[in-house]
């Protein structure tokens, strides 16, 4: 059996796209966050543009990345993520606005929980169905009992 030919290293190729003035650690996290948006899109956890995934920028505890308002999850890229400060001011120029509701929720979490590096907020069909029930998730069925105590 002959060895498999060397595959191009995708991360090396993506590193070549990093803006010259961007910290390599931040670029890597931007790539991972953009990929996370794509995974959520593939799973159908998007509810158009009204869910958010944010990531604290390393070395800047009051700054995080959020998706640009108006773009679908499959359009989010490492380059178009918006870098914003906890007080709502932009941390860098961006051609895209930020969803105010998403900012309010995520800035509150990032401001209160410095150990929360990534915050994910979504409205899945199953999650919303449980949230709409007066008694929430009851543990009277096999599948819901698996979540007892969690």
Predicted regions: what they are:
Residues 2-150:
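Glycine-rich flexible loops
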